Design a protein with these regions (language model features):
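Conserved alpha-helical scaffold segments that buttress catalytic/binding sites
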Residues: 2-174
């Protein structure tokens, strides 16, 4: 928009525009510090009847009304770093868990080559393996261990089985 006043008003309307995490720009990862990535995947559970694939969209909707500055710490992450929402990992074969894990690994491999650090929003637990595989041998880590912050109510880790409902790379184990 050419009118700066109108553009400023529209940016404050959380229901307007492309829904992104915390209303950050929807841009490519190149020359950015952090890329927010949606990973809308549920088939690591052997079914899409569970709704983990709806997580990225739901979080984008909820985060759009939140404040972009932490009042207690007086921290505005968008001033401290260049943060963008690069959208979702595409899953043309969304019901094929093995293919989805390959798509995740490819997507995060390309993201790693851009030099941008990812923050991913899933999806079921099976997304973790593909992400760690891509980043563990990537440019950013240069062979160093990958740091993983996994926020969940439970781990769903099973070490005594080689599959979960037929999925070899599943939400249950890697």
């Amino acid at each position: 928009m050419a009118d700066k006043h109108l553009n400023s008003m529209m940016e404050n309307l959380y229901w307007w525009g492309i829904p992104t995490l915390f209303r950050c720009p929807n841009e490519e990862a190149k020359n950015q510090d952090i890329a927010l990535v949606g990973v809308p995947h549920s088939t690591g559970n052997g079914t899409t009847e569970r709704d983990q694939h709806l997580g990225p969209r739901a979080l984008r909707n909820v985060s759009s009304v939140g404040r972009r500055m932490h009042n207690e710490f007086q921290l505005n992450p968008w001033e401290a770093a260049k943060i963008v929402d690069v959208g979702d990992v595409p899953f043309p074969r969304a019901n094929d868990n093995e293919d989805c894990i390959e798509q995740i690994t490819r997507f995060f491999g390309k993201l790693d080559k851009s030099g941008t650090r990812p923050v991913s929003i899933g999806g079921d637990h099976s997304i973790t393996g593909g992400i760690v595989q891509a980043l563990g041998c990537g440019e950013i880590t240069k062979g160093e261990p990958v740091c993983l912050l996994h926020l969940d109510a439970h781990t769903d880790v099973f070490t005594k089985v080689d599959h979960f409902l037929g999925a070899k790379k599943s939400a249950a184990h890697w």
